[in-house]
Regions:
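Interdomain/boundary linker segments immediately adjacent to catalytic/signaling cores
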Residues: 1-23
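Residues that act as N-cap/strand-start positions at coil-to-secondary-structure junctions
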Residues: 42, 54-56, 86
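Domain-level recognition of nuclease-like catalytic cores that cleave nucleotide substrates
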Residues: 105-149
Length: 149
């Protein structure tokens, strides 16, 4: 939180230090989320492989009994679900609906909770795997914004 001191109220200038701290904080949240999702899927018998550095449109492969899931992991520091999806991730979601999972970890750094969104053909929407009344809308922009409706 030290970076807050470097931002002047009313100023539109954000110091390089605050940007660096924000990037570091985002990386911590993302790493915690990836670790949480990996642990979750391993706990239910999947073999999990990182694809993060390959730029394939998802972060992890999860394989079990001939099933291969493509897991895109989004970590959030709080519990409001609103995540950025890159064009590459969105293209992968659309092209792999049957095996793609959008795994959102809220409160990733303390008391994490996992919500997994899967494609539902009947609703033509991405819905929570445990409560299909929870669905996300995806707003197209240079990157995509997915928000719980």
């Amino acid at each position: 939180m030290d970076y807050i001191q470097h931002f002047s109220a009313g100023s539109k200038h954000v110091s390089k230090k605050s940007v660096a701290v924000d990037a570091e904080a985002r990386k911590l949240v993302e790493n915690a989320a990836v670790n949480y999702v990996t642990k979750h899927y391993k706990g239910i018998g999947y073999t999990v492989t990182s694809r993060e550095k390959e730029n394939v449109g998802w972060d992890l492969d999860a394989e079990k009994s001939g099933i291969c899931l493509k897991l895109e992991v989004k970590g959030l520091a709080g519990n409001t679900i609103s995540v950025r999806i890159s064009q590459n991730e969105y293209k992968s979601m659309v092209n792999n609906k049957d095996c793609y999972r959008l795994c959102v970890v809220t409160n990733a750094l303390c008391n994490p909770s996992l919500i997994i969104f899967v494609w539902d053909d009947e609703q033509s929407a991405w819905v929570s795997d445990i409560d299909q009344s929870i669905k996300i809308s995806i707003e197209e922009k240079p990157s995509y914004l997915a928000v719980v409706e």
